[in-house]
């Protein structure tokens, strides 16, 4: 009698496993907060893994004396992780009742140590949620099992971010996923404009997907990412932070303005002469300006002022 063929069960992709683990938070926090609970922790783990990798390189290079010198990390585009932000320390604190406060402290110290992360990480966030310590510790344990540096394509964390952002957009429903534009659409837009070099601007950048895909386009065509400068602006504070984390994880230097702000009413790049404007604006915004506001704005000089009833024309002229 012939033996039955053994069924080989392929392991689930890491992003799927993480999503399933994160689902256990449902009911404990609002869906609108859910993404920030998870993505900030994934970012912290990724930053620590890169730090540990660089630390080992320094030891192998005979530079152990410089293990705590931040310059030897930032020069390689690696975030320097202060003691308070070390993942190993956080895991030791996972059984403590004030775990949420330790996570907040870790994120605050990481942002303070690294200039490029200013404004990117949540502040005093986890303690304010009142999240059950056991659920938070369980999520930490699952993320702890992930080696974020072993992806064959070298972009595991980018994949996790894209997967989660897409899932969050679906989970939050129509009108609640403005921070995410499907990457198939972004890819098509990028292929159409071919941004090999110059300044790219997205006035409503969401989570930064336009910039990420632009860099992927350059890599696919053997271009030089240093020939591209990235500028953007985002209105929603939490989405602004997502964008900064998303771009930092990819090593993309960007100027998203000093803080989240309305592009129409507080343009943070008034003198920018962009070579490419790549955007998916929130269409059909009503009452986006008052009757006497922005009437003589220089962005539509020589054209009729966009109507107050719909911002579409304003986005085109922007």
Protein language model annotation of sequence segments:
Residues 9, 13-20, 42, 155, ...:
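Generic recognition of stable, solvent-exposed alpha-helical segments in well-folded globular domains
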Residues 1-196, 255-268:
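Non-catalytic, mostly N-terminal accessory regions of nucleic-acid modification and defense proteins
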Residues 5-9, 129, 148, 156-158, ...:
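A generic short-segment signal for beta-strand/edge and adjacent turn/coil regions
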Residues 129, 150, 204, 232-236, ...:
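Hydrophobic alpha-helical scaffolding
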Residues 21, 34, 200-202, 237, ...:
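N-terminal hydrophobic or amphipathic segments with adjacent small-residue motifs
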Residues 298-318:
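Glycine-rich S-adenosyl-L-methionine
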């Amino acid at each position: 009698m012939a033996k039955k063929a053994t069924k080989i069960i392929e392991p689930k992709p890491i992003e799927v496993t993480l999503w399933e683990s994160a689902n256990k938070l449902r009911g404990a926090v609002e869906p609108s907060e859910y993404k920030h609970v998870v993505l900030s922790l994934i970012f912290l783990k990724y930053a620590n893994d890169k730090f540990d990798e660089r630390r080992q390189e320094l030891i192998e290079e005979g530079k152990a004396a410089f293990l705590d010198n931040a310059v030897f990390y930032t020069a390689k585009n690696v975030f320097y992780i202060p003691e308070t932000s070390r993942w190993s320390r956080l895991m030791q604190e996972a059984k403590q009742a004030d775990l949420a406060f330790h996570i907040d402290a870790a994120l605050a110290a990481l942002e303070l140590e690294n200039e490029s992360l200013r404004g990117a990480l949540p502040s005093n966030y986890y303690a304010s949620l009142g999240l059950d310590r056991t659920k938070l510790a369980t999520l930490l344990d699952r993320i702890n099992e992930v080696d974020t540096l072993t992806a064959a394509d070298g972009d595991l964390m980018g994949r996790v971010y894209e997967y989660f952002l897409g899932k969050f957009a679906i989970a939050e429903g129509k009108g609640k996923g403005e921070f995410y534009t499907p990457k198939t659409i972004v890819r098509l837009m990028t292929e159409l404009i071919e941004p090999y070099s110059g300044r790219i601007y997205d006035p409503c950048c969401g989570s930064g997907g336009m910039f990420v895909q632009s860099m992927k386009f350059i890599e696919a065509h053997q271009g030089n990412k240093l020939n591209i400068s990235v500028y953007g602006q985002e209105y929603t504070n939490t989405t602004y932070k997502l964008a900064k984390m998303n771009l930092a994880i990819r090593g993309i230097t960007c100027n998203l303005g000093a803080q989240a702000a309305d592009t129409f009413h507080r343009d943070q790049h008034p003198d920018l002469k962009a070579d490419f404007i790549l955007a998916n604006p929130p269409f059909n915004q009503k009452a986006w300006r008052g009757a006497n506001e922005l009437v003589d704005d220089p962005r539509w000089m020589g054209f009729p002022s966009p109507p107050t009833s719909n911002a579409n024309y304003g986005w085109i002229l922007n």
